[in-house]
């Protein structure tokens, strides 16, 4: 992903299932730190305790995106992982939708 992010710096890259394991979350976080156009999407978070907090702390609250994996997973559970995360409400708002809105708004600019 890093090579693609470098090659296409004006494109936003979203890595899905970033919460699937601690090892993968670490790889994703490293990629985000090196490439500001890369984002972590939070599906599969129920399998890793505190991964939402880890990704925000390892990167920032501007590069983490909410995801549900619905209909495979109950979206209420996925929402709960963010709502109960030990993060400021402002960060939760960014993760739950403001970050994605910013990406879409930027992509729609002429």
What are these regions (language model features)?
Residues 18, 45, 72, 89-90:
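A generic helix-loop boundary/linker signal
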Residues 1-65:
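Catalytic pocket-lining loop regions of alpha/beta-barrel enzymes
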Residues 58-63, 73-110:
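Mid-to-C-terminal alpha-helical segments outside catalytic/metal-binding sites
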Residues 69:
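Active-site glycine-centered loops adjacent to acidic/histidine catalytic or metal-binding residues
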């Amino acid at each position: 992903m890093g090579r693609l992010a470098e090659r296409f710096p004006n494109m936003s890259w979203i890595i899905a299932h970033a919460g699937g394991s601690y090892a993968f979350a670490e790889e994703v976080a490293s990629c985000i730190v090196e490439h500001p156009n890369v984002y972590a999407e939070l599906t599969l978070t129920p399998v890793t305790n505190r991964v939402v907090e880890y990704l925000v702390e390892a990167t920032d609250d501007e590069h983490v995106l909410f995801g549900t994996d619905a209909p495979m997973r109950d979206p209420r559970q996925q929402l709960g992982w963010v709502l109960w995360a030990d993060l400021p409400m402002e960060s939760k708002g960014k993760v739950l939708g403001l970050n994605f809105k910013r990406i879409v708004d930027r992509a729609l600019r002429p």
